[in-house]
Amino acid sequence: MKAAVLTLAVLFLTGSQARHFWQQDEPPQSPWDRVKDLATVYVDVLKDSGRDYVSQFEGSTLGKQLNLKLLDNWDSVTSTFSKLREQLGPVTQEFWDNLEKETEGLRQEMSKDLEEVKAKVQPYLDDFQKKWQEEMELYRQKVEPLRAELQEGARQKLHELQEKLSPLGEEMRDRARAHVDALRTHLAPYSDELRQRLAARLEALKENGGARLAEYHAKATEHLSTLSEKAKPALEDLRQGLLPVLESFKVSFLSALEEYTKKLNTQ
């Protein structure tokens, strides 16, 4: 169980390096930056879409009958959640900083493994890219005369042109599939090698560094406990901030329910 927890932590903390290895794009973000960005986007989308849904509900026949005034309280609710996010920000940042610090050595070893495998597979990736560009250029050269023929020909030649293009498209698809299969075959041993290296690292850590692994687990547990304790005041503020909103909702709902019951009794 400890090994599984540590594996997840290491893979998450080295995830940006792995992504950078395969995609070769912009420099990786820190784990906390990725979590923070994801949470911000999620909360913003939830806030915007939630407001739209509430607005649509209040505009419906049922919403008008209930008259719950949910939209009036929406800004208060979103403000409360934004405040909670701001309060938990430094606490969560501290947690990730501590976790990164404790696993720095193991992450460096994993990064070294990734770089070594990257150096081995890079020629295959470059070769695949080169062949793909050559195939696209070959396809363009074959299609170009047909495009000119279409521009110069009449409408009745369109079907004939489509028949000529069909085998070219199938040929292109088959050749591309062959290159992809070849690349997959070349990369398979290195993927296995990387997986075996990770397993070996963790096995060695478990066998020769049991105390170190237990220390990782103990420190992670300690950091989580600290995070929980520091989050309690912010969560209590959230509860206190939501109480008036929930009370207002309850009063509005009961009032609407009572009015609806009276209407049923008078019918």
From Swiss-Prot:
Keywords: Cholesterol metabolism, Glycoprotein, HDL, Lipid metabolism, Lipid transport, Lipoprotein, Oxidation, Palmitate, Phosphoprotein, Repeat, Secreted, Signal, Steroid metabolism, Sterol metabolism, Transport. GO terms for molecular function: amyloid-beta binding; apolipoprotein A-I receptor binding; chemorepellent activity; cholesterol binding; cholesterol transfer activity; enzyme binding; heat shock protein binding; high-density lipoprotein particle binding. It comes from the Eukaryota. The modification Methionine sulfoxide is found at residues 110, 136. One of its GO terms (biological process) is integrin-mediated signaling pathway. Major protein of plasma HDL, also found in chylomicrons. Residues 1-18 form the signal peptide. GO terms for cellular component: chylomicron; endocytic vesicle; extracellular vesicle; low-density lipoprotein particle; spherical high-density lipoprotein particle; very-low-density lipoprotein particle. Glycosylated. Residues 68-267 are annotated as: 10 X approximate tandem repeats. It is found in: Secreted. Sequence repeats lie at residues 68-89, 90-111, 112-122, 123-144, 145-166, 167-188, 189-210, 211-232, 233-243, 244-267. InterPro entries: ApoA_E (IPR000074), Apolipoprotein_A1/A4/E (IPR050163). Homodimer. Interacts with APOA1BP and CLU. Component of a sperm activating protein complex (SPAP), consisting of APOA1, an immunoglobulin heavy chain, an immunoglobulin light chain and albumin. Interacts with NDRG1. Interacts with SCGB3A2. Interacts with NAXE and YJEFN3. This is Apolipoprotein A-I. It comes from Pan paniscus.
